[in-house]
UniProtKB/Swiss-Prot annotation:
Belongs to the UPF0161 family. It is a peripheral membrane protein. SMART domains: Haemolytic (SM01234). It comes from Bartonella bacilliformis (strain ATCC 35685 / KC583 / Herrer 020/F12,63). It holds the Pfam family YidD. It comes from the Bacteria. GO terms for cellular component: plasma membrane. Could be involved in insertion of integral membrane proteins into the membrane. This is Putative membrane protein insertion efficiency factor. It is found in: Cell inner membrane. Keywords: Cell inner membrane, Cell membrane, Membrane.
């Protein structure tokens, strides 16, 4: 992602740099993902089979769709990221659609796997 900075030009960032509402849940979720990226991710190494990586995907999903939906989307993505799972380019959808409800989190699995079939 490339972010515009008024004085320095373009800055390369690791996570989603688009506009998103800064609600407490989203700030908590993205903060925890960022903490993981700074600490544990460096020790584990880059072993993700997807582009963007699972932590970048979860960060963007939480930023775009909120803590509840974004965390479920990220969880299903992480579960699929294994040697027997899928791989490739899997972007976060820009909108969820009308068939996704907060009380049916298993529907979010369809979003994270439909790009790779």
């Amino acid at each position: 992602m490339i972010e515009q900075h008024p004085k320095q030009g373009k800055i390369q960032t690791r996570n989603y740099a688009g506009p998103w509402r800064k609600t407490p849940g989203r700030l908590l979720g993205t903060g925890l993902i960022r903490l993981y990226q700074i600490t544990l991710s460096n020790f584990i190494g880059n072993q993700c089979r997807y582009m963007p990586t699972c932590s970048e995907y979860t960060y963007e999903a939480i930023a775009r769709h909120g803590l509840w939906a974004g965390a479920w989307m990220g969880l299903f993505r992480i579960v699929c990221c294994n040697p027997f799972g899928t791989h490739g380019f899997d972007p976060v959808p820009t909108s969820l659609g009308s068939s996704y409800y907060f009380y049916k989190p298993w529907c979010y699995r369809k979003i994270s796997t439909k790009h790779n079939k």
